[in-house]
Structure formats: C-alpha cells, structure tokens
Amino acid sequence: MSELLQYSRIKYECTCGKFRTLPDLVFCRYCFKIKCDDCSLGEVDNIFCPRCLEPSSVPEARLKKHKCASCNDCPKCANVLSARTENDNVYLVCQYCRWSSREANQEDQENTKSWPTKENPLVNQLGEVTAYMKRLELIENAPKDLKKGKSGKAWTAFHLKDKFGFQQMVDKRKKALAPEMNPVDAHAPTEAPTLEDEIKERTDDLRTLDQIIMQPLINISEPLLPVQVPLAGRVQVRCDECERTLIKRDFGVTTFKFKISSFARQFVPDIRMSRPVDDLKVGETSHVFLSITNLSSSAMDLTIAPQSGNGFIQCSSDPIQLLLPSSRASDTAAPGVHADQSDVIVFRQHNRVGLRLDVIPTEMDLSSPCLNLLITYCQDGSFRLSSASDKILKPEETCPDPILSANLKVDLR
Amino acid sequence: MTETSTVSIASSAIVCVEADIKGEVIIKEGCVVHPFVVFDATKGPIYVGENNIFEEYAVIRNNSDGQPMIIGDWNIFQVHSKSSAKYVGSRNVIGVHAVLEDGCSVSDDCSVGAKCTVFSHQNLEPSVSVYAATNLSRTTKTPNMTSPHQIEFLRKILPSYHHLYGKKKAVATASASAAQ
Ligand SMILES: [Zn+2]
Ligand SMILES: [Zn+2]
Ligand SMILES: [Zn+2]
Ligand SMILES: [Zn+2]
C-alpha cells in the first residue's frame, strides 16, 4: 500500500531525529511531539493464533509454549494442513504439496488437537540446571538485597497480577529462603557423530533451511512432524514520555477498528509526490510535483522552505507559505494565493494544494538525488482544545497550538 | 465442417458454449468443461478421456506436429492452468496457474501445485507431487481426493446456468445435414 501511494519516497524527521515515512509515525497530543517506533513504547496487549484467531491469556500462552494447539502447518511447504477423516479418526493433509501426517509415520488421531511434537530429550536435565542456577543466584544476591533493605515485602499489586510471572518468582524466593545446594551432575559428553554416520542415517529427501528452522529439534534421520503454528502478539503503542496510550485496537482480534488512534497523519501535513520526476540532467532545471493535504481537523498554517547543500539537491524555489483549510471544512473556498497567481502553486482543491518546485541537480546528486524541505506548521488551536477536553479550559488558555517544524527527505529517484 | 475441425463431445459431457475449441478434439463421457476453456488442436488432435474437469481459463494446447495429445480419466485442470503435455494419465490435479510445458508427460495420481511448472523434458512418475516456488518434486503416499461428488454436482448445476456447446453444435450439424 505504501508503495502504491508512494509514501516510501518521503521521509519525515521524527522528534528523536530519525527519518520515517508518515504512516510509521504517531503523534502524542499531550507532549505535542511526533513519535516513531524507536521513541515510543510497544506493549503486547493480545496474544492470538494467526490461523484460527483464538486469543490466549499470557499464562495460557506460556503453558502452550506460544503455539496453537489446534492449528498445524505443513513441514514441507509451510501451508496450512487440513484434517481428513477416515474411520472416525483424522489425519492431516497439505492440500498444496500432498504431504500427510501418515508420511511422518504418525497414527491417525481422534481430533486435530495436540498433535504430537518432538520434545527436547534433555528437557528434564535442562530444568534441573536452571533450577540450580536460580538457587545459586539467590544465594549470591541475598547479601545485596539485605543491604538495600529489600526483604521481599516490596511487592506491589502490579506483581500480583502476575502478568510477567513475578508471583511465581516471589513464591520461589520465599520457598528458597534456605536453599539446599545439590550440585547437578555435569552432562556427560557424547561422541560427536562423524560425517559418515550422518550420511548413513540420512533419508533421501534433503531439507531446505526453512524446513529445518521450523523444527530444529528433529534430526535428519527422523521424519518431519506437523508444525504447530506459533502465536502472534498484537501491540499497543504508548508515548515514552507521558506514557499515555497512542494506539490501541478494539477488544477482540477479529476487529480492525481502533479504540485510540493518534497517527501522525491526523496532524502533520501529508506530503506526497504527485508525479514521477523526469530524468535529471546536470545543470538543467527539473520540476518536482508535490501534493500537500491537510488531514487534520483544524486549519493549518504551513511554510515549506527548500533547503540546499549538505549533499541535498539544489532547489531554486523560494519558501512558500500556505493556509490549508481542514478536511472537515473542505467545501468552503480556500483562502490564500490562487493557482493562477503563482508559479509554484499548480492547483488548489479543498484541503489539498499542488506545488511545483524547481531543482537543479549537480554531478554529485545524480547517483542518489534527494530534496530536503523544512516544513513549519501550526494548527489554529482546536487541536490542543480537543486534546484537553477532559478539563475545562479558561479563555486565556485557548492559545494557538505550538509551532512545529520538521525536516523532510524526498527521494527523487 | 472440414475434416480437421471435428469436435466430438459425448452426450453426457457438459461443455459450456463459451469454451473455445479448435481442431480435432474428442471429449468422452462425463467430462465437465467450464466457460472460457481453450482446446487448441490446430497442430494435432486432442483426445480427452472420461470424467475430467476443466476449470475456467484452462488452456489445453497441442503444440506437437500432428502427434496426438492424450488425457486420461478423472483429472482436474484448475483455473488458468496451461497444459501442452503429450500425455496426462488419470486422477491428476493440475493446480491453479500451473504449467505443463510442451512434450512433458504426467502419469497417474500426480499433483502439480499452484503456479508450479512441469518442464518439457520431465516425465512425472506415478504419485509425484510438484510444489513450492522452486518446483520441488517428490513421491507421495497421499492420494488425490478426486471425489465423484464434485463432478456430479457440476454436471447437474452447470446446464441450469450456461448454454451448452453440444446443443449449439447439434443444431448446426442438423442444419448442415439437412442441407446435404
Ligand atoms: Zn523517533
Ligand atoms: Zn490456531
Ligand atoms: Zn505442504
Ligand atoms: Zn506524550
């Protein structure tokens, strides 16, 4: 989609200095700052199976090892496996490559749930070792905790929710106040298989890297098993400064609606290239056509100043000031310069303006021509009003919104 | 009608009138040919067995010089598949947008996955499955599910919504024989 709308060609500068495309940016109305994925906080708010869309709670997902119990993928081609019934039992078949669970020498099952998977043969030993390491950790940390005055009482209601398994840790700590130390036996070394052994044991079909990655525990001598579908997480976004939620989807994984959405598009002018740039020639003037749309709910005062130098293409156009009406008031005639009175403004259409900028490339620009624009914009104040709707504003507080500015990189290739 | 453009369709076969049939083509009992299927037998005859399904926009083209192209029984040629194979056996599934190149051959119980290609030098052994973007192939134990219900349903439902090739041809041949 972003390729189709050519969003990827124009990068906006985030508050943190990184350049991102407009759909990747969010806006915090309270801090009045643009935020990107690097300077906002992501938080998993829902875990679900991408195939059957069944949601799982966090402990449930941990119990299931973050895999769906009822959905399986083909180990050969990673397509969905479907169940075929025969004599009241089911087996799994890939409709695409015709792999079936019978090829893996699997007995037919009564239902599609909990298809057998390969477990790590060393799982018990691993558990013992981790438990031992935890006990060691406790003993090592005990004097430090005492010094700090932390005595295990400082747990809050936050931990009782057990979202991150803290409760278990607390219980374990309490239990392990006097941990006993039984060193675990070292894992006895086994002979490394020789190349001849591996070739002897190998079945005829060679596996692709993808197939091995899907089931890393299965040896080359064993048949591939149905792959349990890994669960997916849905992320909600918070501002890293004020911790307010910026993006939150509606309850339920099947919906695409948002409960809270504060995308940068709703605030920042949406600037796109309206026409591809002709072939650039050194020393000759070329035109760059931009369309600027105000998608916010209030009128916008916008100045676009082309920046030259520093490795960016030379632009001969003067800075231009525009007053863009809001998308809601789009049927009222737009104030400001009319299209026929300016060289720069190509068209004016409700809340959208078309611009033509002249660029003169030099030899250096031709390999990666990039136009740098400095945009300075300001809303008429209704934006701040709407953000503060939870408290009553005094008349003197209804000031215009702060002026924001951002650098833009336009890729002219 | 000239000798080289003889189309023979069995009485129980359902061939939609939008199908484009050129040259010597024989379609036997129980076949279902959806609209916009192309049979191009201008370079050599095409003999189709019983109970095959040809889905929309499937192209069956004989590119050999006069060699007959033979298709067995109970095959499914899915939407937009292209076949110039000299021989296709029985109970095969040729997937969506799959291509059987000139001169290749497919035996029985094979499946060619969506968008896969069987190259012209290839002769598929029985029960071979061709899959993935790189046209991997292997022998499979899982049979194709060519259920008779699907073709029965199609034979029943298609005539209610489409004009049939056989009907139009019958009228044409009747008037032709009357003129003789
Ligand atoms: Zn950022
Ligand atoms: Zn699932
Ligand atoms: Zn498969
Ligand atoms: Zn904030």
From Swiss-Prot, chain B:
Gene: dnc-6
InterPro entries, A to Z: DCTN6, Trimer_LpxA-like_sf
Signal peptide limits: none
Keyword vocabulary terms for this entry: Cytoplasm, Cytoskeleton
GO MF terms held by the record: dynein complex binding
Protein name: Dynactin subunit 6
Role played: Part of the dynactin complex that activates the molecular motor dynein for ultra-processive transport along microtubules.
Assembly: Subunit of dynactin, a multiprotein complex part of a tripartite complex with dynein and a adapter, such as BICDL1, BICD2 or HOOK3. The dynactin complex is built around ACTR1A/ACTB filament and consists of an actin-related filament composed of a shoulder domain, a pointed end and a barbed end.
Keyword Phosphoprotein: no
Gene Ontology CC: cytoplasm; dynactin complex
Species: Caenorhabditis elegans
